[in-house]
């Protein structure tokens, strides 16, 4: 979780209160205090509240909690003077774009650092290390609109941030620190994303690096903000950044985004989303009776717009910068925070309900211990994936046992995974900048025919990775679990013929292991030999 350093003088100015009150009340808005210094406080905010990843966002929330300023924050937005066109070709590479202009900002070195920290924390919290969301912040005075978001050849040259000489985009990916770190995000594409002004000056090579021309300094007053990505989280990130800048006195200005697929968009869209909450929902979840007036009061303390429609129903306006409100339960949680958990009376349960470990946990613990003992690190990736990752990249045929997401919000999360190995290979692809060998495993859930199963899988990448290495790992795991097994020749297309095997226990196939096929390695843009295994452990659950 991100740890944000907040300067007292900045926070006191933005909240209108003193540092003693800040230290005392900060945990109540959803944070843990990590460190208290003479001039600053380090606060760890929960990952579901990216709107608190800046001093401006934290101050906005704290003003409400302290009853200094309650209800929905309102931001004036000026008509658009800047436009940006989106090319057809970029839609196949990085299709989502959100933009805004913020004028009249007075920067200091600390406020610039705060903005850059917010940018990087959002890359982590919303962007999955820039894959889903990447943010560019530019000095608008050094470029000339209208702008263009397009795809260009890898040989295109410009001067990247912190450099003085022109480099081709290929050279940036090979030599620039940011390029080598994030090259995997554009690897495999024949053209790369770029944002240009009307004179062909480079603003950004998203999601890698900005051009040096638009660097933000203390003399900067007007900003152009671009957010690119793979889904609608782009717009949430844009809203968080522009409202944070508005809290510091900036004037938000619309930008006209001209798309080839959906026409014109006028961004940012700061219109709040409307939800309807009932008094009964609050009572049933909190276990206590609150009046309709009290519920409205606590929602406004948490910076929602709230209005009682009758004695049972409240209309709630959710700020456009809140990424965490997915259900009415999230509203009730904020009501509890506003009311104060310390004010909720303790009630001892009337029935005695002793707990015990779940059978899955009883199997997970020894398996994890064995894998860690074999030198593997545990990872816990997402269970949502795509057909491309789950099947195409693995050279496997699509099956009929897939559970699909009805309304996916991004192209890389359209189904629930049926196997663990593709996720592990994705993680290796994201960590190519780290030392080899890399050995990771997961004990996790897969879903086939809408039935949840438990699998364990592991992969190892380094130049000498081979069949014998992974065979020894599988053998050690099976021996430690005291499972007699046999291996037979496999036909799994994800692995090399002659260097793959199926695992059988009591005549039933349990899994597969071997050396991955070069095509699979290339599909995940991995540069070294990779071996792996995956075992279905469902039949072992509940066994002593």
UniProtKB/Swiss-Prot annotation:
Its EC number is 6.1.1.20. Keywords: Aminoacyl-tRNA synthetase, ATP-binding, Cytoplasm, Ligase, Magnesium, Metal-binding, Nucleotide-binding, Protein biosynthesis. Its cofactor is Mg(2+). Its main location: cytoplasm. The keyword Iron does not apply. It is found in: Cytoplasm. Transmembrane segments: none annotated. Residues 270-346 form the B5 domain. Mg(2+) binds at residues 324, 330, 333-334. Belongs to the phenylalanyl-tRNA synthetase beta subunit family. Type 2 subfamily. This is Phenylalanine--tRNA ligase beta subunit. It comes from Methanosarcina barkeri (strain Fusaro / DSM 804). The lineage of its organism: Archaea, Methanobacteriati, Methanobacteriota, Stenosarchaea group, Methanomicrobia. The gene is pheT.
């Amino acid at each position: 979780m991100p740890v944000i350093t907040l300067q007292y003088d900045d926070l006191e100015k933005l909240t209108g209160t003193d540092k003693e009150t800040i230290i005392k009340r900060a945990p109540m808005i959803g944070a843990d205090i990590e460190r208290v210094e003479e001039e600053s406080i380090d606060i760890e905010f929960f990952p579901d509240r990216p709107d608190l990843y800046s001093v401006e966002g934290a101050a906005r929330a704290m003003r409400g909690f302290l009853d200094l300023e309650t209800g929905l924050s309102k931001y004036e937005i000026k008509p658009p003077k800047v436009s940006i066109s989106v090319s057809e070709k970029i839609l196949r590479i990085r299709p989502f774009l959100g933009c805004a202009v913020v004028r009249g900002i007075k920067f200091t070195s600390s406020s610039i650092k705060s903005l850059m920290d917010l940018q990087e924390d959002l890359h982590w919290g919303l962007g999955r290390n820039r894959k889903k969301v990447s943010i560019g912040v530019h000095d608008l005075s050094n470029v000339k609109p209208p702008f263009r978001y397009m795809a260009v050849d890898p040989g295109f040259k410009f001067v990247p941030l912190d450099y003085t000489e022109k480099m081709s985009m290929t050279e940036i990916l090979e030599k620039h620190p940011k390029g080598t770190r994030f090259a995997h995000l554009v690897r495999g594409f024949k053209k790369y994303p770029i944002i240009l002004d009307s004179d062909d000056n480079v603003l950004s090579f998203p999601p890698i690096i900005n051009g040096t021309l638009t660097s933000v300094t203390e003399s900067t007053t007007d900003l152009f903000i671009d957010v690119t990505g793979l889904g609608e989280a782009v717009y949430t990130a844009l809203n968080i950044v522009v409202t944070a800048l508005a809290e510091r006195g900036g004037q938000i200005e619309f930008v006209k985004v001209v798309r080839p697929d959906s026409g014109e968009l006028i961004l940012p869209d700061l219109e709040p989303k409307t939800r309807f909450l009932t008094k009964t929902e609050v009572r049933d979840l909190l276990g206590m009776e609150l009046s309709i007036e009290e519920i409205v009061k606590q929602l406004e303390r948490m910076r929602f717009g709230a209005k009682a429609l009758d004695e049972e129903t409240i209309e709630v306006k959710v700020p456009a910068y809140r990424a965490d409100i997915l259900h009415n339960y999230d509203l009730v949680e904020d009501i509890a925070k506003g009311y104060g958990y310390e004010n909720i009376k303790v009630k001892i349960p009337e029935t005695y309900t002793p707990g015990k470990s779940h059978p899955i946990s009883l199997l997970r613990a020894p398996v994890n211990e064995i894998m860690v003992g074999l030198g593997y690190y545990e990872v816990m990736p997402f269970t949502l994936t795509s057909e491309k990752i789950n099947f195409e990249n693995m050279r496997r045929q699509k099956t009929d046992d897939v559970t699909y997401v009805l309304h996916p919000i991004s192209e890389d999360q359209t189904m629930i995974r049926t196997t663990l190995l593709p996720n592990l290979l994705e993680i290796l692809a994201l960590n190519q900048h780290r030392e080899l060998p890399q050995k990771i495993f997961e004990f996790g859930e897969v879903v086939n025919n809408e039935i949840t199963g438990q699998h364990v899988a592991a992969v190892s990448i380094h130049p000498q990775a081979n069949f014998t290495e992974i065979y020894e790992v599988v053998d050690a795991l099976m021996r430690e679990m005291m499972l007699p097994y046999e291996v037979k020749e496999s036909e799994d297309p994800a692995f090399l013929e002659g260097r793959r095997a199926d695992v059988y226990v009591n005549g039933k196939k349990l899994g597969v292991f071997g050396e991955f096929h070069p095509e699979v390695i290339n599909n995940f843009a991995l540069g070294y030999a990779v071996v792996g295994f995956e075992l279905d452990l469902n039949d072992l659950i509940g066994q002593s």
